Amino acid sequence: MGKKIKKEVEPPPKDVFDPITIESKKAATVVLMLKSPEEDILAKACEAIYKFALKGEENKATLLELGAVEPLTKLLTHEDKTVRRNAMMIFGILASNSDVKKLLRELEVMNSVIAQLSPEEEVVIHEFASLCLANMSVEYTGKVQIFEHGGLEPLIRLLSSSDPDVKKNSIECIYNLVQDFQCRTTLQELNAIPPILELLRSEYPIIQLLALKTLGVITCDKEARTMLKENQGLDHLTKILETKELNDLHVEALSVIANCLEDMDTMVLMQQTGSLKKVLSFAESSTIPDIQKNAAKAIAKAAYDPENRKVFHEQEVEKCLVTLLGSDSDGTKIAASQAISALCENLSCKEFFNTQGIPQIVQLLRSDNEEVREAAALALANLTTSSPANANAAAEADAIDPLINILSSKRDGAIANAATVLTNMATQEPLRAIIQNHEIMHALLGPLHSTNTLVQSTAALTVAATACDVEARTQLRNCGGLVPLVGLLHSKNDEVRRHASWAVMVCAGDEPMAVELCRLGALNILEEINRSLSRKNKFSEAAYNKLLNNNLSLKYSQTGYLSSSNIISDGFYDYGRINPGTKLLSLKELCLQELNDQRAILLVNNKSDTSPPPSMEDKSSDVGYGRSISSSSSLRRGSKEKANAIFGSPTEEKSEPASVRNTILSRAFTKEKGVSKKKSRLQLICSSYLLWKGKGKKEEEKVKEEEEILALPKFTEGSPEKEWNPPPDPEFCVYVLEVTKSILPIVNLKEQIEVLAKYVADKMGGKIPKEKLADFSWELHISELKFQLKSNVVPIGYIKKGIFYHRALLFKALADKIGVGCSLVRGEYSRGWNEVKLVNEARKGMIGNLPPPEEYIVDLMFHPGNLLKLRSKEADLYRFL
């Protein structure tokens, strides 16, 4: 045998690195290993980083600071499955950190992550890729990237995965994505509802819960509800409700059912299958507040459909809701109240709550929870709308007091609802009186000052409903409510402006309120509104006319016209023509002005501090106007004697100096100017006057005159606190008495007008021929009256030489007193006239449609008593120069 030769060991290649085992305890070292070209090292480094990231948020932040994210993103596309899997596991954990999510969006790794969802990949990769997407989908920008890169379809496919973690992550991501409408639409196109319904059979509650939440979102769309119904989704939901062990899913299941009940077809189907009855019974018997609340919400959502309301009524849903009102949960009370509000659109439902439900709702008005009070007030508002019976039931349940308390609530919705209920109640007079006794006007002061348009609108409407009598309007004025009410007329909101106009129209129902509203600028605002085609409304026009019709002095000054329905009352004054928007001073302000050379202000006042003596009544009782001038003159002399005894004659020439006479007269006429004078001062003046007047007279005559002077009205001695009254006009009082006794009994209207015209002409200077009109010195007479009265205001009865507009005003004032309809028109150049309507005597008694009455102008100047047909030549000559 030959000798064995020993083989020589070959040395290792020079370019091969000797293996080295490294143990590192620093994350930074491992992060550096992510750049290694060796697959084994990459896999081990990723595994170590995964374990490190699992330990907490601080470690995730550390990895981000060490720059681990960017090299890891490159490993998502590595050829080695282990490296790729381990890198994906890291991102599944790291993506819960908000800073990491932000960086991942910037690095645009979404395509790489979604690619890991392909069927060829391992289940572990599916798990962590879906987990990464679930974390990324929490933020809106992440949702957009997932959707735009086609992530929805593979996620839906993974719902059928055998791994529960994959299912859980996928349905969670889908739930986040479907918050966006576009994703919901795409989900339906991808037929995602069947696999989602299948998840309801899962043995894992979290998967079932996420599936129900997803269905609760997507069934907000009608198409999704249809697909759910076609795939027997309602059966799945009903079974969940019937299973007590799944009580943690009942709330979400009811939310899905609530959406489905919005469809009439679904409602009918549930009614036919008995599912609806089961749902209502379940809600009524449940002791879980959230279940009761969601059941009530389901009813409320479905009840907005008219057909659904009918079905609910057939299922006696009202009883269920009344039971829910007694829940201990405020949320359930709110939801039940809202459901009742929706059901009230159905008349049968509204009638049911008349006997049951309203007392329970009224109790909720006293709740400490303001949201409960708001919901209860909403239910009561809908229950009482167009339902006097329910309004009475609410009042009987003592709802008025808590409703008025709610008007001071901090929640605008509660205030608006409470105001609506009070408005509905106030349509009935007995309830309105009760509401007024609770100081409703003072309670509305806060809502009228609100900046919320809904509160403003309802508050103004409540004012319109409750300010129907003088006491309520006075209460509103005294508490300062007119100022904010007028301010609401400036609103840019159409409903606020309309309701404010309505309230102003109601408040202008009496003259003092109309005058006050005009003083606050309501008339000017309404005039401006009515000039705008876009802002005006029927109520603004009606309010404007109502203000003028109850403030005739302003109306006549602005428009120069009073219709036959505009009845002149005591205190009316003719200031003369003013331009629209110009402020008209009050009568008191005009009376207190210094004497000026402007046009005299004519006053109509039948109220007097003194009354005609009994002898006057006796004398005038047998006097019919038109018998003789002497009879009329005797009456006039009697009235003059009375007036002279008090004021001094304004027309007769006196032998005493004018200064003494005018001093006494002015103090008797304008009580404001003599308020501060003491009685001793007045007696001193009167005594001086009597001493001067009594020279050469007998002692008994002096005593008589002294008694007459001391019989002056006592307003010269009044205190400053005494209420101001317009200057009295005893002459006009006599006129009213005379025409009432002599002209009112006349049966024929035309004869009444003619006799009254002659009477007025006689009191104002008699017949004036046209050719002597220029010689009729009425201006001097008026100036003398102003000087004697020391006032710019002249009572109409004092005028004995009157021109057209004086006579027309006196005719209108007297005609209104005896019920003779006539209008008053202001012309140019001191012209004024009255228009009357008369039926043609020849057509009286004829059968069939009668022609309209003819209009005439009453001649008070040239031929007193003549009736001039309107628009005739004679009438035009009377009206115009």
Curated annotation (Swiss-Prot):
Coiled-coil region: none
Binding partners and assembly: Homodimer. Interacts with PIK3C3, PIK3R4 and BECN1. Interacts (via ARM domains) with ATG14.
Protein name in UniProt: Armadillo repeat-containing protein 3
Region annotation Disordered: where it falls in the sequence: 605-659
Role this protein plays: Essential for male fertility and sperm motility. During spermatogenesis, promotes the autophagic degradation of excessive ribosomes, providing energy resources for mitochondria and thus ensuring sperm flagellar motility.
Lipid sites, type S-palmitoyl cysteine: 507, 518
One BP term from GO: spermatid development
InterPro entries hit by this protein: ARM-like (IPR011989), ARM-type_fold (IPR016024), Armadillo (IPR000225), Armadillo-Ser/Thr_Kinase (IPR052441), EDR1/CTR1/ARMC3-like_pept-like (IPR055164)
Effects seen without this gene: Mice have normal viability but show complete male infertility. Autophagic degradation of cytosolic ribosomes is blocked in ARMC3-deficient spermatids, which causes low energy levels of mitochondria and motionless sperm flagella.
Reported modifications of this chain: Palmitoylation is important for its function in autophagy.
Species for this entry: Mus musculus (Mouse)
SMART domains: ARM
SUPFAM superfamilies found in the cross-reference section: ARM repeat
Domain of life assignment: Eukaryota
Keywords linked to the UniProt accession: Autophagy, Differentiation, Lipoprotein, Palmitate, Repeat, Spermatogenesis
